[in-house]
């Protein structure tokens, strides 16, 4: 950064948030009222300006019960008396969206589902029996494979009529109606069973069978199942069960002591391949593509067809998630006078515009290791979230930090993490996490707890004060960023797993080199890039957006660009603008 007062923007209006450490406060024990008050006073004494009430595994009072809200009310009142902020973590324990399991208990139709596929080659005349996990059959087709190994999704035999119910488990056990026979044979574990004999084909030809079912997700973290995060009705019910109940109990402090809601980890699930029964219809409506007919193109390379299908799939799933979750939660929070903050997987950076304080999950390291400032994982990219905070006029950029560093974490470790996050533009530090108790197994919940359990806690005001000053410095300065880097997210969407990994690694390596050489930059979502303007000033061509002007646009290795982005970039080039393209 340059200390040039003409270039720096003083933005004291952004300091209305209490800066410094704002820890998750894990409510993971008996939650005695006197202990709640005592721990809040401990935080206050060390300069901690606020906390996030995080119902956590191990909590001994029932979530969302009268006993629970009695304690929430006490914590809010104590914070109010001590001029501290309170944030409400919106789940028990995580990820957000299910109200401790209540959403799908009351509405099982909102259960999360995912795709399971069985793929098999079959020779002409061969009998094929395939078992797919129990669920609604979406696709059962045998595609005719030519001698050169190629095949078309338009040339197939429909196998739906060859599918029925079967079982995959045989059971032999002691059980019987009479004493004469105590041994019984049973079957279990329902499956969808396909039984088909392929017709004869020419020499060198064969069939490729795709058998795809829509399966209810099981064994999902704490809840066995999860919700359909693309279904707006499911998320509307989550808000009713969670946010509305907090409003009923402590709504009088919304916008005062209670500053907002923190949401965590929720995304379009399953994260590697989002699904919803609503998705095919929305892809058809928004993109004009029949997703079911083209499912194999999600997994295999059919050239341009795969590119179009994958883009339509990911773009639609992303928009559906934003509409179902982010937009609804943000709207509710704003209507009720509180902020919507948090961190979760980043499908594309434009989704961060809906957070009032956008966040990431990074910085879980100790001094002596190499700072992982840039990795392929968007959710850990501090520069991406700081860029979003800049472009979308957010008061801060947040990071959940200190997760799983271990009980040996020191204040030196914390300062080092804060420093490299600060370089990236992070000025709101959410510590993971302050334990109400570290008794018994609870000490193993992604430690440490940099709270009263630590031998250095008596000096914790030093690290709290440092974090506060760092945040104030960052919020009252303007970065001297001369480069604009276009997010290559849509190229990752349309690529196979290996290519996607390479593109993300290249994107991370580019950012690392820019920072290493002192070349500051912002990352911009292609959707936002389209809204910029090409201007000529002082004999130079600039790209203007958000009141800033950039001489150089950097295009990381990409495989495609959205139409609006392509034409805006082309306009900049034709006017004489500088574009640095990498491959």
Region roles according to the model:
Residues 1-10, 141-152, 160, 227-228, ...:
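Secreted/periplasmic carbohydrate-active enzymes, especially glycoside hydrolases
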Residues 4, 17-22, 26, 32-38, ...:
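Carbohydrate-binding surfaces of carbohydrate-active enzymes
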Residues 5-7, 40, 44-46:
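N-terminal regions that are enriched for targeting/export leaders
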Residues 11-24, 214-217, 221-237, 241, ...:
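An acidic-aromatic substrate-binding cleft motif
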Residues 54-181, 187, 216-236:
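Acidic/aromatic-lined carbohydrate-recognition and catalytic surfaces
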Residues 174-186, 192-195, 202-214:
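Surface-exposed interaction regions enriched in Ser/Thr/Asp/Glu
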Residues 198-232, 351-372, 554:
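Aromatic- and acid-rich polysaccharide-binding/catalytic face
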């Amino acid at each position: 950064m340059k200390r040039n007062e003409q270039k720096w923007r003083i933005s004291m209006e952004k300091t209305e948030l209490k800066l410094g450490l704002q820890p998750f406060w894990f409510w993971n024990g008996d939650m005695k009222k006197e202990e709640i008050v005592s721990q809040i006073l401990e935080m206050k004494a060390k300069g901690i300006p606020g906390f996030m009430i995080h119902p956590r595994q191990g909590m001994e009072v029932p979530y969302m019960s009268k006993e629970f809200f009695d304690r929430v009310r006490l914590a809010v009142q104590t914070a109010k008396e001590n001029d501290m902020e309170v944030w409400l973590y919106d789940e028990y324990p995580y990820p957000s969206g299910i109200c401790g399991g209540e959403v799908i208990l009351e509405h099982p139709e909102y259960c999360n589902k995912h795709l399971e596929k069985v793929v098999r080659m079959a020779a002409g005349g061969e009998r094929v029996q395939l078992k797919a996990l129990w669920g609604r059959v979406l696709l059962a087709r045998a595609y005719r494979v030519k001698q050169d190994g190629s095949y078309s999704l338009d040339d197939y035999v429909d196998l739906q009529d060859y599918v029925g119910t079967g079982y995959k488990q045989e059971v032999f056990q002691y059980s019987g109606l009479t004493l004469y026979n105590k041994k019984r044979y049973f079957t279990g574990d329902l499956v969808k069973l396909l039984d088909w004999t392929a017709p004869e084909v020419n020499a060198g030809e064969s069939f490729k069978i795709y058998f795809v079912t829509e399966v209810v997700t099981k064994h999902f973290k704490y809840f066995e199942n999860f919700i359909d995060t693309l279904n707006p009705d499911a998320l509307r019910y989550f808000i009713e069960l969670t946010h509305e109940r907090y409003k009923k109990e402590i709504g009088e402090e919304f916008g005062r002591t209670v500053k907002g809601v923190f949401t965590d980890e929720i995304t379009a699930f399953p994260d590697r391949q989002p699904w919803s029964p609503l998705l095919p219809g929305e892809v058809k409506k928004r993109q004009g593509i029949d997703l079911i007919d083209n499912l194999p193109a999600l997994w295999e390379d059919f050239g341009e067809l795969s590119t179009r299908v994958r883009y339509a799939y990911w773009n639609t799933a992303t928009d559906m998630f934003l509409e179902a979750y982010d937009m609804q939660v943000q709207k509710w929070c704003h209507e009720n006078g509180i902020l919507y903050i948090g961190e979760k997987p980043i499908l594309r950076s434009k989704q961060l515009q809906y957070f009032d304080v956008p966040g990431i999950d990074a910085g879980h390291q100790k001094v002596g290791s190499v700072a992982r400032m840039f990795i392929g994982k968007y959710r850990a990219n501090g520069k991406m979230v700081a860029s979003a905070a800049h472009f979308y006029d957010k008061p801060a950029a947040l990071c959940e930090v200190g997760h799983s560093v271990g009980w040996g974490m020191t204040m030196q470790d914390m300062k080092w993490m804060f420093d490299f996050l600060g370089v990236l533009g992070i000025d709101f530090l959410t510590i993971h996490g302050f334990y109400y108790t570290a008794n018994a197994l609870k000490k193993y919940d992604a430690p440490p707890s940099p709270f009263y359990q630590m031998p250095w806690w008596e000096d914790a005001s030093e690290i709290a004060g440092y974090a506060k000053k760092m945040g104030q410095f960052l919020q009252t300065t303007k970065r001297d960023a001369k480069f604009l880097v276009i997010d290559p997210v849509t190229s990752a969407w349309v690529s196979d797993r290996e290519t996607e990994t390479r593109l993300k690694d290249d994107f991370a390596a580019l950012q690392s080199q820019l920072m290493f050489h002192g070349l500051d930059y912002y990352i911009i979502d292609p959707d936002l890039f389209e809204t910029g303007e090409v201007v000529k000033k002082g004999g130079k061509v600039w790209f203007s957006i958000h009141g800033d002007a950039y001489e150089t646009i950097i295009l990381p290795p990409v495989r495609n660009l959205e139409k609006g982005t392509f034409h805006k970039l082309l306009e900049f080039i034709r006017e004489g603008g500088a574009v640095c393209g990498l491959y």
